[in-house]
């Protein structure tokens, strides 16, 4: 642990500050992020890097499907569509949809999406 705290604490601070580079560096130290934590950098990437966003969003969606028990096909499709909206004018709606899917499956996604629980 450095004087700045654990890698997870640095990751969280970097996300809160919108510092994608610092978040990625801390995430590398962690090696594996929870599904919830892995969503936060995608929200940041959605603002600036379109090609990178697509890859990250599809990868996260795959994890959602694999790690969430009882995810229905309509929920999976809705989650993918909600991820796609993060780069456009409906970004807030997309974040709300993802948070609701998370709530239904007991995943605390609201914080990663910068929404109040």
Per-region residue spans from a language model:
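Long, low-complexity, acidic Ser/Pro- and Gly-enriched intrinsically disordered regions
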Residues: 1-117
């Amino acid at each position: 642990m450095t004087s700045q705290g654990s890698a997870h604490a640095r990751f969280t601070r970097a996300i809160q500050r919108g510092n994608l580079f610092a978040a990625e560096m801390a995430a590398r130290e962690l090696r594996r992020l929870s599904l919830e934590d892995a969503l936060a950098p995608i929200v940041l990437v959605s603002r600036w890097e379109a090609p990178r966003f697509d890859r990250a969003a599809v990868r996260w969606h795959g994890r959602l499907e694999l790690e969430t028990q009882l995810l229905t096909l309509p929920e999976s499709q809705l989650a993918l569509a909600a991820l796609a909206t993060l780069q456009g004018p409906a970004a807030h709606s997309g974040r709300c949809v993802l948070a609701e899917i998370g709530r239904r499956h007991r995943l605390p996604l609201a914080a990663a999406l910068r929404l109040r629980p």
